């Protein structure tokens, strides 16, 4: 019996955010695609300068939202900081939570913080 789209959607709905991030990464590798949104073409670069793909990202907490305690817990879990330091980051938003993270780590951290109720940007 083949899986239907509805079966797949229900299975994904039951997964944790980290499992979904891993699933997306596996699908990107398997099918050679990217889940990133298409970006409009910018001005052409000089022929002698090769465009470099960004490999390091900063995860910035822009707002804690209504569930501040959950966001503090998520920051502590992701960074290993103590309660006081994590609370200072959350209270001082916008603040950088993690610098020079890989694309996958940044996406996973963003997902975890958003699940906790925070607003997050990746730069």
From Swiss-Prot:
Which Gene3D superfamilies does this entry report, sorted A to Z? 3.30.1390.10, Single helix bin
What keyword terms does UniProt attach to this protein? Ribonucleoprotein, Ribosomal protein
Kindly indicate whether the keyword Ribosomal protein belongs to this entry: yes
Q: Name one GO biological process term.
A: translation
GO molecular function terms listed in the Swiss-Prot or TrEMBL record: mRNA binding; structural constituent of ribosome
Cellular component GO terms, alphabetically?
cytosolic large ribosomal subunit
Determine the domain of life of the protein's source: Bacteria
InterPro entries on file: Ribosomal_bL12, Ribosomal_bL12_C, Ribosomal_bL12_C/ClpS-like, Ribosomal_bL12_oligo, Ribosomal_bL12_oligo_N_sf
Q: Fetch the CDD domains from UniProt.
A: Ribosomal_L7_L12 (cd00387)
> Which residues does UniProt call coiled coil?
none
Protein's job = Forms part of the ribosomal stalk which helps the ribosome interact with GTP-bound translation factors. Is thus essential for accurate translation.
Q: Which family does it belong to?
A: Belongs to the bacterial ribosomal protein bL12 family.
Summarize subunit and interaction data from the UniProt record for this chain.
Homodimer. Part of the ribosomal stalk of the 50S ribosomal subunit. Forms a multimeric L10(L12)X complex, where L10 forms an elongated spine to which 2 to 4 L12 dimers bind in a sequential fashion. Binds GTP-bound translation factors.
Q: What is this protein called?
A: Large ribosomal subunit protein bL12
């Amino acid at each position: 019996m083949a899986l239907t789209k509805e079966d797949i959607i229900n299975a994904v709905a039951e997964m944790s955010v980290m499992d979904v991030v891993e699933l997306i990464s596996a699908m990107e590798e398997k099918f050679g695609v990217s889940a990133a949104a298409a970006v409009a073409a910018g001005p052409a670069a000089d022929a002698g300068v090769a465009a470099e793909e960004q490999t390091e990202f900063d995860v910035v907490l822009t707002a804690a939202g209504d569930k501040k305690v959950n966001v503090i817990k998520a920051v502590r879990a992701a960074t290993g900081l103590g309660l006081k330091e994590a609370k200072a980051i959350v209270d001082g938003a916008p603040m950088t939570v993690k610098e020079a993270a890989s694309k996958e780590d940044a996406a996973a951290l963003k997902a975890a913080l958003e699940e906790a109720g925070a607003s997050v940007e990746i730069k």
